[in-house]
Amino acid sequence: MKFADAMQCIGKESLCFHPELNVFVNYPVLIGCHIGYLVVIVLLYKFMKGRTAYVLKYPMMLYNTAQVALSLVMAINLGQFLVYGVFNLNGGFTGTIEYWIFVHYATKFLDMFDTYFIVLRKKEEQLSFLHIYHHVTIGFIWGLLLHHGVANGTAFFGAWINSAVHALMYFHYLYTSLGYTNPLKTYLTQLQMIQFALCILHAVLAVVAHSPIPKKWAVLQLCYHLTLLYLFMRFYRKGMRKLKRKAKV
């Protein structure tokens, strides 16, 4: 496997191994796509006003199946770098990591269909601030890392663990779309919070330890995952309170 000097890659302020993909991570694309996401939500809301909710059982089954498959492929291809240390803090940059992080970034735009399905099915109770915040920021941040040439080396960990968790999450969605109840749903939220806690630990280590990636990006990761952990903990507590009220009834 070909490794490159991390500092040379970072100095390019560009994808190091796949510069042909730079067009997909420039600022007009990053900003435009995420503004477009919000515009589509508003337009769909207006379209659905006065209309009956769509069922979308089979489109969602196909969508969730594709998401499980994509997430597994990304997790497997990025997981090979775990042998260089859990966080690969001092790892060299490779074309493989850069490519699969780009794929991971691209899937964040596919993930936006989670929101579109919610609006079309009129499941407004699922459309929380956490949901919108996550979808409008995660792709933008990965795009920033790619745009500045730092989505490589130790950055593999965030994409790997997110892909692994997403494989389980979309399998849950697929399973429940078939009409089954998943008794492990609560543990899935706990797993997501563990993911954020590990990403926070990863960011702290990247700040205090020697790592070729500039510390400002580790600080960005730290701050971002702190917000996600806080919001998910609020969501989890709210869900647990709701379960307790149902149990009393």
Curated annotation (Swiss-Prot):
Q: Which GO terms describe its cellular component?
A: endoplasmic reticulum membrane
Q: Which InterPro entries match?
A: ELO_fam (IPR002076)
Ordered alphabetically, the record's keywords are: Fatty acid biosynthesis, Fatty acid metabolism, Lipid biosynthesis, Lipid metabolism, Membrane, Transferase, Transmembrane, Transmembrane helix
| Biological process annotations from GO | fatty acid elongation, monounsaturated fatty acid; fatty acid elongation, polyunsaturated fatty acid; fatty acid elongation, saturated fatty acid; long-chain fatty acid biosynthetic process; sphingolipid biosynthetic process; unsaturated fatty acid biosynthetic process; very long-chain fatty acid biosynthetic process
Which membrane topology term applies here?
Multi-pass membrane protein
Short motif (HxxHH motif): ranges:
131-135
The reaction(s) annotated as catalysed by this protein in its Swiss-Prot or TrEMBL entry are: an acyl-CoA + malonyl-CoA + H(+) = a 3-oxoacyl-CoA + CO2 + CoA
Q: What Gene Ontology terms describe what this protein does at the molecular function level? A: fatty acid elongase activity
Active site, UniProt feature? 134
Q: In which compartments does the protein localize?
A: Membrane
| Pathway where this protein functions | Lipid metabolism; polyunsaturated fatty acid biosynthesis
Q: Which residues cross the membrane?
A: 23-43, 68-88, 100-120, 138-158, 159-179, 193-213, 217-236
Pfam families for the chain: ELO
Question: What Enzyme Commission number(s) apply to this enzyme?
Answer: 2.3.1.-
Tell me the function of this protein: Involved in the synthesis of fatty acids. Elongates C20 polyunsaturated fatty acids (PUFAs) with a preference for n-6 PUFAs.
Please report which protein family the annotation says this sequence is part of. Belongs to the ELO family.
For this entry, the protein name equals Fatty acid elongase 5
Q: Please name the source species.
A: Leishmania major
Lineage here is: Eukaryota, Discoba, Euglenozoa, Kinetoplastea, Metakinetoplastina
User: Which gene specifies this protein's sequence?
Assistant: ELO5
